[in-house]
Amino acid sequence: LWWLPESGLLAAMLALLAAACLLLPRGAPGRLLGLLLWLPLLWPQRELPSGPGALDMQVFDVGQGQAVLLRTAGHALLYDAGPRSRSGFDAGERIVLPALHALGVRQLDMLMLSHGDADHAGGMAALVASLPIGQVRGPAGMGQPLHGHCQADDHWQWDGVVFTVLHPPRHFPYLGNDASCVLRVDTAHGSVLLAGDISALVEQRLLRAGSEALAARVVLAAHHGSSSSSSGAFVQATGA
């Protein structure tokens, strides 16, 4: 199959006009020129971030789980892969992968799994089987095969956007939710904080390490908004 990015309204209207042209009687002048009006469907606008420091963030609706796409001008990172349930429903295959196709994402530079629970890492296998992925990273000790681990103070820069891992520190034991990779993304227009499923205990540790690193314009609530996370002090420190 040849996957095409989702087209805009203008391209769809031009395609309908092209179909109307082709339905004209044979011999009608310019009838076959209607084929040219289908070209915008083949090369749709991808609406990528433009310029240094720009970021596009898409939070996919995967139900009880998480999958977040972060795109700079030339790179793409997926934070978590969506859930896979015991019934066999795989959000990585049914939701995340079609959404990536619709957005024109043909490969991922990185898949970062916050931790190994099925609602965050369950869709990994479907994505790895279907997309070229530069590297898969997650906390040390999780069961899934990884190319490398996320550790505090890891940082890199793509197209003027800076990515920094705040948690877990080196040699931190794998504790499931509380071992989640906490990722901070600094752009030219503000910061994003992705906290996985950490609890208030880890939030307190991050506060002791320095609340200035938590200040962000956008925060995705930890552990799906659980009452065991998003403590008052943490929320106040983010100022989101």
Regions found by a protein language model. Give the residues of each.
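Proline-aspartate-enriched helix->loop->beta-strand connector
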Residues: 105, 133, 237-240
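Short Pro/Gly-enriched beta-strand edge/turn motifs at strand-loop
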Residues: 49-54, 159-170
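Conserved beta-strand hairpin/beta-sheet module of binuclear metal-dependent hydrolase folds
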Residues: 51-98, 102, 107, 176-200
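Active-site-proximal loop/helix segments of hydrolase catalytic cores
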Residues: 60, 92-96, 114, 118-127, ...
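Structural recognition of the beta-strand scaffold that forms the well-ordered cores
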Residues: 76-80, 109-113, 135-138, 193-195, ...
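Active-site HxH/HxHxD metal-binding segment of metal-dependent hydrolases
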Residues: 116-153
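Transmembrane helix-bundle segments that form internal channels/tunnels in multi-pass membrane proteins
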Residues: 1-58, 71
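Short acidic-hydrophobic surface loop/beta-edge motif
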Residues: 70, 151-160, 183-185
